[in-house]
């Protein structure tokens, strides 16, 4: 029995799930159930870690690790004896350093060892996008840092995980205890123009999201543009036209400049197709080919969901059908966070393209 088997066995047996979690309704059981042998997901990682912790180490693997550690201890003792024999026992070079050098092990190898060892611990851990972590995620991280020395970076207004953090005190007090952690809030917005920052902040406050009082350092006239069209098909053509103009203004052949389109999931493929068929008329075919062949992680023109752009910034952003983005979210607060993320990505220009019906459904 190992952690993978345990989690797989749990998810593939709905009757067992019902017995172990009687508070779940039929929809909850159905959402968790999957075929036996199905691939593990990102959300399974902390559950696997918990299962491995409860089950304990695999005896075979534990024996291999013990043998490896014993060999390492012998090598370090031999190295220490050697250093002592030449009068260098208390010098700058330690026995551990000498063994690493003899075995060809440097900092990179140590990092590889840490990645391969589930029980490896650290003196300090830096967590980014911390608002997205669930209670089980935090349990996994705390195991890696027994000293509980953390630098935690996040924005609770951007929380999209249903089990994430909406208030820092509720999560931090449980993890570290009251008055045993410090909160420092950023109050200066260097990314967004004042016009974009004000729009996003007003929306977040009305939606019930917690945000710090932020002052933007730049003002750019016409930084926010709102475009209303007749139907959803018109939003695609209009967004593509604006992307072409924004690309001409902000995207350079030297690889600098970024434009992003953020839209509901069902519109992403038609948007991407229409945009790259529109670009040649503005940028020429050669430049369009260059842009279309870029890797997704470094694309100068990106088309994606709110989740795909979190943590990134762009010179210009086109948000398409924000009301539909809100409608597709799993909860009201997640919807608000998704839109707040979308509106706070641009450093220069925010364009909102939507139908009149979409505008009626959500005022921005």
Language model segments and positions:
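Conserved helicase NTPase catalytic core signature
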Residues: 1-124, 134-138
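Conserved helicase motor core of SF1/SF2 NTP-dependent helicases
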Residues: 55, 80-124, 129-364
């Amino acid at each position: 029995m190992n952690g993978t088997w345990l989690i797989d066995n749990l998810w593939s047996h709905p009757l067992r799930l019902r017995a172990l979690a009687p508070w779940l309704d039929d929809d909850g059981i159905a959402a968790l159930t999957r075929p036996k042998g199905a691939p593990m997901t990102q959300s399974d990682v902390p559950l696997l870690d918990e299962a491995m912790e409860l089950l304990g180490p695999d005896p075979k693997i534990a024996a291999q690790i013990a043998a490896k550690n014993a060999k390492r201890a012998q090598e370090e003792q031999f190295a220490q004896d050697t250093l002592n024999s030449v009068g260098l026992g208390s010098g700058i070079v330690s026995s551990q350093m000498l063994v690493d050098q003899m075995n060809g092990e440097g900092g990179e190898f140590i990092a590889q060892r840490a990645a391969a060892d589930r029980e490896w611990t650290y003196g300090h851990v830096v967590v980014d996008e911390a608002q997205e972590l669930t209670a089980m995620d935090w349990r996994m991280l705390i195991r890696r840092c027994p000293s509980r020395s953390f630098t935690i970076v996040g924005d609770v207004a951007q929380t999209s995980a249903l089990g994430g953090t909406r208030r820092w005190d509720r999560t931090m007090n449980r993890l570290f205890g009251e008055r045993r952690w410090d909160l420092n809030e950023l109050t200066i917005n260097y990314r967004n123009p004042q016009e974009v920052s004000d729009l996003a902040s007003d929306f977040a406050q009305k939606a019930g999201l917690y945000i710090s009082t932020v002052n933007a350092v730049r003002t750019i006239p016409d930084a926010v543009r709102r475009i209303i069209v007749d139907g959803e098909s018109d939003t695609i053509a209009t967004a593509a036209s604006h992307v072409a103009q924004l690309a001409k203004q902000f995207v350079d052949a030297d690889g600098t400049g970024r434009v992003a389109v953020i839209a509901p999931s069902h519109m992403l493929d038609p948007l991407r197709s229409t945009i790259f068929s529109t670009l040649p008329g503005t940028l020429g075919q050669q430049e369009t080919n260059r842009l279309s062949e870029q890797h997704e992680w470094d694309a100068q023109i990106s088309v994606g969901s709110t989740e795909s752009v979190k943590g990134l910034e762009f010179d210009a952003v086109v948000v398409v059908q924000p009301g539909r983005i809100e409608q597709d979210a799993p909860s009201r607060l997640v919807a608000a966070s998704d839109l707040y993320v979308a509106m706070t990505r641009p450093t220069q220009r925010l364009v909102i393209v939507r139908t009149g019906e979409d505008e009626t459904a959500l005022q921005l």
